[in-house]
């Protein structure tokens, strides 16, 4: 699943909703920082993605992969919290879309 596209779709749906009032949410924004990597990937990328009051960071070997990882974390937070305040809700049908989080792992042990 392309989580960056999912966040963009949520943002567009939110802007086009007739029930959206008084709360402007800017589109998802990403900031990249290069990091020292490994011998296999000499440069790693830290992506800090912000959307709807959430900010998540992820590190990966390419900017695109780091952005996808950060977008997945924000999508999970939106799902967990019930969506954007005063607007769209996000309920995913299949929990298998997300890897098992640390929070879920602690309950299974």
Curated annotation (Swiss-Prot):
GO biological processes: symbiont-mediated perturbation of host apoptosis; symbiont-mediated perturbation of host cell cycle G0/G1 transition checkpoint; symbiont-mediated perturbation of host cell cycle progression; symbiont-mediated suppression of host innate immune response; symbiont-mediated suppression of host NF-kappaB cascade; symbiont-mediated suppression of host PKR/eIFalpha signaling; symbiont-mediated suppression of host type I interferon-mediated signaling pathway
Any one GO CC term of the record: host cell cytoplasm
Keyword 4Fe-4S in record: no
The keyword Iron-sulfur belongs to this UniProt entry's keyword annotation: no
Keywords, comma-separated and alphabetical: Apoptosis, G0/G1 host cell cycle checkpoint dysregulation by virus, Host cytoplasm, Host-virus interaction, Inhibition of host innate immune response by virus, Inhibition of host NF-kappa-B by virus, Modulation of host cell apoptosis by virus, Modulation of host cell cycle by virus, Viral immunoevasion
Localization annotation: Host cytoplasm
Main location as per UniProt: host cell
Function of the molecule: DsRNA-binding protein that plays a role in the inhibition of host innate response. Suppresses host PACT-induced activation of RIGI and MDA5 and thereby circumvents the production of type I interferons. Also prevents the activation of host NF-kappa-B. Inhibits the integrated stress response (ISR) in the infected cell by binding to dsRNA and inhibiting EIF2AK2-mediated phosphorylation of EIF2S1/eIF2-alpha. Stress granule formation is thus inhibited, which allows protein synthesis and viral replication.
Subunit: Interacts with host PRKRA/PACT.
Name of the protein in its database record: Non-structural protein ORF4a
Organism annotation: Middle East respiratory syndrome-related coronavirus (isolate United Kingdom/H123990006/2012) (MERS-CoV)
Lineage: Viruses, Riboviria, Orthornavirae, Pisuviricota, Pisoniviricetes
